[in-house]
Amino acid sequence: LIKDKINNYILIKQKFKKFENVRFKGSDFKKKDLLIKKNTLINPNHIMAFKTLGVGNIKVKKKINIIFFSSGNEISENNYIPSWKIRNSNHHYIKSLKNNFLFNFKNLGILKDNDEKKFYNKLHKILKSKTNIIITSGGVSKGKFDFIPLIIKKFKLSHFFKDVALRPGKPILFAKIKNKEKVIFGLPGNPMSSAACFRFFVIPYIANILGQIREKPIRGVLKNSFIKKKKFTRFAKSKLTTTKDGKIEIEILKGQESFRVKSFI
């Protein structure tokens, strides 16, 4: 549009279509439109739509409540430790995931090698609470002080398994308390074993409770050779890249041992 100050009129240099630049009621959202499906994970885009439409309250599922125990005299929360001690990375790693995977996290400290009675009493109390998942780290293998499985079996269970053909993470334990919506995951103590079991057992369990869509695997071309034992399912730390023509390539990284963290960064 151009305004001519001399002749005091506006020169329109193009034709207008009827109703151009007019916003009609219902042109964006219509009455009874479904905004989001049930079990959808709400993101900032949904919040924008809710506020635009004046939606003040929505029904959501409660976050899962997780209680966490570490175990072993060798585990320490201190930064400065003697040579026989290990810093407690598993507790902090899992806690850091609570916002990503919709759970509340409470740490109940480190169980010492002779804390069988203490662990039993704690479990007995927790099973009366609103806790959904109990996680232990370490103490599930076949060592002298690995008492976690023995204590768990003292409770009435509807489901139980221990040890899977998986690396890292072979010693994992799972138990469901009979007549209660409460489960126990016993994770191995090595950092990568613990991380793998949390990722491929605990997170899918949480997603299932919340009604989230099942994950689909991504397939790609392996760039380097990798040998594994046939009887084991193997999870390997890898680097995924996309080529210029859109192909997915996967590189298996060095340092696959379950105690090595560097290649996980």
Report residues per predicted region.
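Short, well-ordered strand-loop elements centered on a beta-strand within folded domains, enriched
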Residues: 8-14, 183-186, 243-255
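Helix-rich terminal scaffold detector
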Residues: 59-187, 191-196
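C-terminal terminal segments
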Residues: 30, 86, 214-265
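Glycine-rich, charged/polar anion/phosphate-binding loops
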Residues: 20-22, 50-57, 159-160, 170-172, ...
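A charged, well-structured terminal subsegment
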Residues: 198-218
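Short, glycine-/Ser/Thr-/acidic-enriched flexible segments
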Residues: 41, 73-74, 140-141, 189-192, ...
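Solvent-exposed alpha-helices and their adjacent loops that cap or buttress functional pockets
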Residues: 4-5, 27-29, 42, 57-62, ...
